[in-house]
Amino acid sequence: MLNKLSRLLEQAGISLTDHQKNQLVAYVDMLNKWNKAYNLTSVRDPNEMLIRHILDSIVVAPHLRGERFIDVGTGPGLPGIPLSIVRPECHFTLLDSLGKRVRFLRQVQHELKLENIEPVQSRVEAFPSEPPFDGVISRAFASLNDMVSWCKHLPAQDGRFYALKGLVPDDEIAQLPEGYSVESIAKLQVPQLEGERHLVVIKPNHF
């Protein structure tokens, strides 16, 4: 699996250390093992996990600005765990309301010795925002409108929302709450992944 990951990274033009590659493979191994009992993801094939979970997450890294991020509705740690591995200088709070997912995240944190993550079991509306975050990240969490409405207390004044989407969600963009606008839309290149992937970056208009 390490060779497969190395080929995918090369195709994506991403350079990682051997330690980072080993951490990503170890995470996939854990996800595959726990998935059999806890049903954490619908992807059953570890090689598919490399494409649809690992690469699909880390291609976002160059677009993130800041040092403190929160991954809302992280599930089994996506995209937060892969991002924390490739951006070790940043801190990621991983938020999910389901206990089984957070237990898995804590086990990953322990086994991979990830000191820059904090798994938290909470609903996003109930989670305090002190201190505020540089970025709020979501992948398959909610519509843009719901994401901004539920998470508006989390980012700093000049913070951003980062939403991973498939096709550009024009209908969701049109329904953004007042006071927010799209700063950029980046087409993400994920090797061997069928379908389009985009990162929508949303900013508050006061900044």
Swiss-Prot record:
<dbReference type="GO" id="GO:0070043">
    <property type="term" value="F:rRNA (guanine-N7-)-methyltransferase activity"/>
</dbReference>
<feature type="binding site">
    <location>
        <position position="78"/>
    </location>
    <ligand>
        <name>S-adenosyl-L-methionine</name>
    </ligand>
</feature>
<keyword id="KW-0949">S-adenosyl-L-methionine</keyword>
<dbReference type="InterPro" id="IPR029063">
    <property type="entry name" value="SAM-dependent_MTases_sf"/>
</dbReference>
<protein>
    <recommendedName>
        <fullName>Ribosomal RNA small subunit methyltransferase G</fullName>
        <ecNumber>2.1.1.170</ecNumber>
    </recommendedName>
</protein>
<dbReference type="InterPro" id="IPR003682">
    <property type="entry name" value="rRNA_ssu_MeTfrase_G"/>
</dbReference>
<feature type="binding site">
    <location>
        <position position="139"/>
    </location>
    <ligand>
        <name>S-adenosyl-L-methionine</name>
    </ligand>
</feature>
<dbReference type="GO" id="GO:0005829">
    <property type="term" value="C:cytosol"/>
</dbReference>
<keyword id="KW-0698">rRNA processing</keyword>
<comment type="similarity">
    <text>Belongs to the methyltransferase superfamily. RNA methyltransferase RsmG family.</text>
</comment>
<keyword id="KW-0963">Cytoplasm</keyword>
<dbReference type="Pfam" id="PF02527">
    <property type="entry name" value="GidB"/>
</dbReference>
<keyword id="KW-0808">Transferase</keyword>
<feature type="binding site">
    <location>
        <begin position="124"/>
        <end position="125"/>
    </location>
    <ligand>
        <name>S-adenosyl-L-methionine</name>
    </ligand>
</feature>
<keyword id="KW-0489">Methyltransferase</keyword>
<feature type="binding site">
    <location>
        <position position="73"/>
    </location>
    <ligand>
        <name>S-adenosyl-L-methionine</name>
    </ligand>
</feature>
<comment type="function">
    <text>Specifically methylates the N7 position of guanine in position 527 of 16S rRNA.</text>
</comment>
